[in-house]
């Protein structure tokens, strides 16, 4: 009924990503899955419609991939050793991968602290091997987090350079004004670009 959609609205207005009750294992709580069932189904369908012509992830730098949240079957192919999941609204089965969840609302720009946390997690997960950073489409939330890592690791000198790196790999990346403002706010502590631009080392 309509009240279920109102719960989604409350998440955006009051509760934030926590309202989806996504746990550290990647699954939404049973209560959230029941309360939000129509919205969750719509989110899955929307993700499929937007990415059906290009479902595959793209390698931004060696060992670092950007894409939509994969299905269990897609994760089982062994391409990745680690997954950073930026969705709040979609459940995920990590399939034994090194997994971290950083739930973010769709259509809402991450804040600076989200971006800093993501950069730490990306460094941590890259040590495990090939890493996929994912959101529902792989175009905005996850792209913003990877851009933040590029900036904070010195692999990009400024926001436009970071966006250019992303779009060379994944042309559909879309970072709006709000996302760019967040990334620009990181610039005060961004180091000089690395001499080894583009190189990602694994432990």
Positions of predicted regions on the chain:
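Cytochrome P450 heme-iron axial ligand motif
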Residues: 132-145
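N-terminal membrane-anchoring alpha-helices
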Residues: 1-51
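Short, electropositive, low-hydrophobicity segments enriched in small/polar residues
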Residues: 20, 71, 142
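Cysteine-based protein phosphatase catalytic domain of the PTP/DSP
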Residues: 44-133, 149-186
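Long, low-complexity, intrinsically disordered segments
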Residues: 197-203
């Amino acid at each position: 009924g309509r009240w279920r959609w109102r719960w989604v609205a409350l998440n955006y207005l009051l509760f934030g990503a926590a309202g989806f009750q996504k746990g550290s294992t990647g699954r939404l709580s049973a209560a959230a899955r029941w309360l939000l069932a129509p919205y969750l189904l719509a989110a899955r369908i929307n993700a499929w419609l937007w990415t059906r012509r290009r479902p595959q992830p793209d390698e931004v730098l060696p060992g670092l991939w950007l894409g939509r949240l994969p299905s269990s079957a897609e994760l089982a192919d062994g391409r990745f050793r680690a997954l950073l999941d930026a969705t709040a609204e979609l459940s995920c089965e990590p399939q034994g991968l090194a997994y971290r969840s950083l739930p973010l609302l769709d259509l809402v720009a991450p804040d600076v602290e989200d971006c800093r946390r993501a950069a730490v997690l990306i460094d941590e997960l890259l040590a495990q091997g090939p890493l996929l950073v994912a959101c529902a489409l792989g175009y905005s939330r996850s792209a913003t987090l990877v851009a933040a890592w590029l900036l904070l690791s010195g692999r990009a000198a400024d926001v436009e350079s970071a966006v250019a790196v992303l779009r060379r790999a994944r042309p559909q990346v879309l970072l709006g004004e709000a996302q760019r403002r967040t990334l620009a706010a990181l610039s005060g502590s961004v180091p000089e670009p690395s001499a080894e631009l583009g190189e990602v080392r694994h432990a």
